[in-house]
């Protein structure tokens, strides 16, 4: 299965075989020396050109390749390590360990290109996935095997929310997480690794990085590398896995770069004509089966804040819930800075979450919306000009705002407050009490950065005695 290179165009390499035609997505190895240093480059077949010639995408830099160079087809797609051995380690797109640690002690490998679970194997039951984060569980609950879009600019706390979710899954569900850095900044990937190490969650997560400086093939396929590791835990171990993709926009962006290099005619805004199909290929594999589930949280970058751009628009079609982080909320010192009016969930329905949950969540949103509407009047005329009823709404809304904040386990080193996991029952009990006016006589400071309502009452007692 030997062949030779006939053309190199940046990350696209044409290869010719004398008596063999590799299948689409098959891996091809090229071993060559650059300045005396041995290099192993992996190519992936993307198109058949006829006459036993194939067009491939390189998974690493192609500097040093020359025409006529020998290559060897593997006869199978790229395979990556799976199983418990991958936890706490960092991998690149081809499954090599890149954290400078000891070699991997496992021979178990799975191909990155796999079929999505069939209809009969999928689980049709919609279950809520408890995260232990009050604002998420109350306003925009995640569903098991669902997909969540995490929208937010730089510095509003996307990474901290991701790390807390990884911690809570490990702590409450004894589950594992997989993090795929798709077109990530190397610095951010490095920071995340060290923060997870300090936060004590590294041994429950596998990290896969295809950074910004890598060719489009690596940035595109890294999502499949991470997903394959997650699928193993779901299908073989029967676990509920959490899968993080940061950033899903870069997956679409790298696909558009590859498409142009492969000579396909671009469609709207220069994106690949196969954008919807490629997005579906990835997203359809993220689902619940009868054995376990993969719940994914995907950070979504919105170019120029244009939600109608084809890339984010192709993601929206697949999302079950959106968690929107707002800078205005983080400026108030309320963390997590989730916008309770901007975040949505498909399962916030009385038939799925229950009548009480739905009633409390909509009640909270109504009070916060009323407070938002009154803010202009308060800014111009002050609180004294409001009616007694409106004053009560404002007081309750301010308590709700503060009660939506929560000390995180992974942020203990910054806040000095021990982290709190709040069950859904405790969350509903607390917000229901505020809406009913049970805690109207308690100062709003008592609700800031606490877990359940009991802690708020204890804090109020301490403030009173101080």
From Swiss-Prot:
GO molecular function list: ATP binding; ATP hydrolysis activity; proton-transporting ATP synthase activity, rotational mechanism
PANTHER family listed in its UniProt record: ATP SYNTHASE, ATP SYNTHASE SUBUNIT BETA, MITOCHONDRIAL
Q: Which annotated residues bind ATP?
A: 152-159
Instruction: Give Gene Ontology CC terms.
Output: plasma membrane; proton-transporting ATP synthase complex
**Subcellular location(s) of the protein:** Cell inner membrane
Reaction(s) catalysed (UniProt annotation): ATP + H2O + 4 H(+)(in) = ADP + phosphate + 5 H(+)(out)
Q: Does Glycosyltransferase count among this protein's keywords?
A: no
Q: Which domain of life is it from?
A: Bacteria
Looking up Pfam families in the UniProt record yields:
ATP-synt_ab, ATP-synt_ab_N, ATP-synt_VA_C
Keywords associated with the record? ATP synthesis, ATP-binding, Cell inner membrane, Cell membrane, CF(1), Hydrogen ion transport, Ion transport, Membrane, Nucleotide-binding, Translocase, Transport
Q: What is this protein called?
A: ATP synthase subunit beta
Q: How does it sit in the membrane?
A: Peripheral membrane protein
Whom does it interact with, and what assembly results?
A: F-type ATPases have 2 components, CF(1) - the catalytic core - and CF(0) - the membrane proton channel. CF(1) has five subunits: alpha(3), beta(3), gamma(1), delta(1), epsilon(1). CF(0) has three main subunits: a(1), b(2) and c(9-12). The alpha and beta chains form an alternating ring which encloses part of the gamma chain. CF(1) is attached to CF(0) by a central stalk formed by the gamma and epsilon chains, while a peripheral stalk is formed by the delta and b chains.
Q: Which organism is it from?
A: Helicobacter hepaticus (strain ATCC 51449 / 3B1)
Family per record: Belongs to the ATPase alpha/beta chains family.
Known EC number(s)?
Answer: 7.1.2.2
**Biological role:** Produces ATP from ADP in the presence of a proton gradient across the membrane. The catalytic sites are hosted primarily by the beta subunits.
Keyword Cytoplasm assigned to the entry: answer is no
């Amino acid at each position: 299965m030997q062949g030779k290179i006939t053309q190199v165009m940046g990350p696209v390499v044409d290869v010719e075989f004398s008596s063999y035609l590799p299948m689409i997505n098959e891996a091809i190895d090229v071993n060559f020396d650059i300045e005396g240093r041995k290099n192993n480059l992996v190519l992936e077949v993307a198109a058949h050109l006829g006459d036993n010639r194939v067009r491939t995408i390189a998974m690493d830099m192609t500097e040093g390749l020359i025409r006529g160079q020998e290559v060897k087809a593997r006869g199978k797609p790229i395979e990556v390590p799976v199983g418990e051995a991958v936890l706490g380690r960092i991998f690149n797109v081809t499954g090599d360990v890149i954290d400078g640690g000891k070699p991997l002690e496992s021979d178990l490998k799975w191909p990155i290109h796999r079929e999505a679970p069939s209809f009969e194997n999928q689980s049709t039951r919609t279950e809520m996935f408890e995260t232990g984060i009050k604002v998420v569980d109350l306003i925009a609950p995640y569903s098991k095997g669902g997909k969540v879009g995490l929208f937010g600019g730089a510095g509003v706390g996307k990474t901290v929310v991701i790390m807390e979710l990884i911690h809570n899954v490990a702590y409450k569900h004894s589950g594992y997480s997989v993090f795929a850095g798709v077109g990530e900044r190397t610095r951010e990937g490095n920071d995340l690794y060290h923060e997870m190490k300090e936060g004590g969650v590294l041994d429950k997560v596998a990290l896969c990085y295809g950074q910004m400086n890598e060719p489009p093939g690596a940035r595109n396929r890294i999502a499949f590398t991470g997903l394959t590791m997650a699928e193993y835990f779901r299908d073989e171990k029967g676990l509920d896995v959490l899968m993080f993709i940061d950033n899903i926009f870069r997956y679409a962006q790298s696909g558009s770069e590859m498409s142009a290099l492969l000579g396909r005619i671009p469609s709207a805004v220069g994106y690949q004509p196969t954008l919807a199909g490629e997005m579906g290929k990835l997203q359809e594999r993220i689902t619940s089966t009868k054995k376990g589930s993969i719940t994914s949280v995907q950070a979504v970058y919105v170019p120029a804040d244009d939600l109608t751009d084809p890339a984010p628009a192709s993601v929206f079609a697949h999302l079950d819930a959106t968690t929107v982080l707002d800078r205005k909320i983080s400026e108030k010192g309320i963390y997590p800075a989730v916008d309770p009016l901007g975040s949505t969930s498909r399962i916030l329905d009385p038939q799925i979450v229950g009548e009480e949950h739905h009633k409390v969540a909509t009640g909270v949103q109504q009070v916060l919306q009323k407070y938002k509407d009154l803010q202009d009047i308060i800014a111009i005329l002050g609180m004294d000009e409001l009616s007694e009823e409106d004053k009560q709404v404002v007081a309750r809304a301010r308590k709700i705002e503060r009660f939506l904040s929560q000390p995180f386990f992974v942020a203990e080193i910054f806040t000095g407050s021990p982290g709190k996991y709040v069950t859904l029952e405790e969350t509903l009990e607390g917000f229901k009490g505020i809406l009913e006016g049970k805690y109207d006589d308690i100062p709003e400071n008592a609700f800031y950065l606490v877990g359940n309502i009991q802690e708020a009452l204890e804090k109020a007692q301490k403030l009173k005695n101080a």
